[in-house]
Amino acid sequence: TVSQDGRLVHTDEIRQTNEQGPHFIIQFKKGDKICLGAQEMVIPCSNRLIITKITVNEFVPFSKPYFRWIEQNASLVSSNVLSSFNALLNPELLKERLNFTKEHVAAYRVGNPEGIVFFEDAHFHSIDVKKLCLETIGASVDILSMNEEELNHTLNHMYQEGVDVEDIISSVEGAKSIRRMFGVRKGVVIHTKDYSMYVGEPLKADIERGLIYGNLLATAKANNGWYGTKEQVKEVLEFGFGDRGMKNYQTVRESKYAEETVLVPSKYMDKPKFTIGLGDSFVGGVQMCF
């Protein structure tokens, strides 16, 4: 990252300047039973419940030296990832942050016209804030990325556009709707536990390779609980592909959307040991293809 005096440094050298915002995360494995009084619930698939203590995330203070370094060294930055707006609740503050971000993106493009601006969606604490964010920043980004829960929430609950995330063709059409609605420049990435896919125009980068890297790093983290080492990623290569991912791959390949869709099945884990930070690992993996 970039220090306050503008140097590129390892994160170990950075000092904390704000109060920590601990997350309380309760993981549930597929088949677990939760008992509340006389009620009993069986977990249908591995997931987690996150209870967030809001501190600095509610304001998202920007480090100006970080943005300045990227703008001054844009030719060295092949992709520029935007995220972390999801805990903001004040629309005026969000507008201020987004306007700054749009100016930053414009400056980055001047220094690197081929650079990829990548926006990772999240679970927002306010629907109105999420709408403002997507509608403001969407046209400035090359790729908008989200998981299938966010695809479902955005189209079915926020905009009543309609998508069935259990149907891969509906999901492809949903990704196309996302791109159209927000004016995303190149395409949309959808990532799930069974597959990941890119829907949009052809890229100079090998996005299929990026999706593979993303899937492997996310699965390695699900299997080990931390960012996968080379040896741990090698272990994941021995896993088989899941039925849903393979079925979706074949369906897309035979569909009218085959030319504009790249789908990669994930290595299958029925009961992952960990379900935290998998999206972040996926996004990190994808960046390697740029």
Identify what each model region corresponds to.
Residues 1-278, 290:
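Ribokinase/PfkB-type carbohydrate-kinase core domain
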